[in-house]
Amino acid sequence: MNMRKYMIALAASLALFTGRANAQRCLPGMQGIEVKAAMTDGFRMSGNDGGHSFGALLSTYTKNGNKWSLGGEYLLKNSPYNDVKIPVAQFTAEGGYHFKVLSDARKIVFLYAGVSALAGYETVNWGDKVLYDGARLHDSDAFVYGGAVTLDMEVYVADRLALLASLRERCLWEGDTRKLHTQFGIGIKFIIN
């Protein structure tokens, strides 16, 4: 009888003091693949000056939920000229570090602020210097470098799947076109280990 009371007391105390387990997310060493798309310099889908970008990143989590990222991006921005668009494309590689600014207790929503170094190539009108009306472009293709500051939000919809939203400002030097680009983007992240 004494053993029975002891077992009941043990079971009651375990039921009383056991906390709820949360998902194991953003642990050091975990990696994820991010695929993103963004509108560049505004939300203009029509017209001659709308821009967009696509990118993929590998992110690796460190202590406190912070993360390193390494990846690449393609950005296309059209510059208006009479009735046509002159494409300006940038192909960049990037590496950066993102600090966890905020997260909820259940580890579903995360907010990050990060900085990245960028390097790549910029091409104007795909290298063609003469326009349809005989005008010549003075802007030339060039290797570019610079950086970006990013504000990212991750919302986990499953343990290995997150939806992403980002606001980003890129600054690249050595190109002949616009130096700063603001990006508003969405994406998806797959945790791979």
Segments the model singles out, each with a brief description of its role:
Residues M1-M30, N193:
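Cleavable N-terminal export/targeting peptides
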Residues N22-G71, K77, K189-N193:
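Short glycine/proline- and aromatic-enriched beta-strand/turn motifs that initiate or cap beta-hairpins
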Residues G29-Q31, N48-F54, K85-A93, V109, ...:
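Residues that define the transmembrane beta-barrel architecture of outer-membrane proteins
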Residues D41-R44, S79-I86, D133-D139, C171-G175:
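Extracellular loop and loop/strand-boundary signature of outer-membrane beta-barrel proteins
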Residues L57-Y132, F190-N193:
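Gram-negative (and chloroplast) outer-membrane scaffold detector with strong preference
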Residues K77, D152-N193:
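Predominantly the C-terminal beta-signal and adjacent terminal strand-loop region
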Residues W126-L167, F190:
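Extended low-complexity acidic/polar segments
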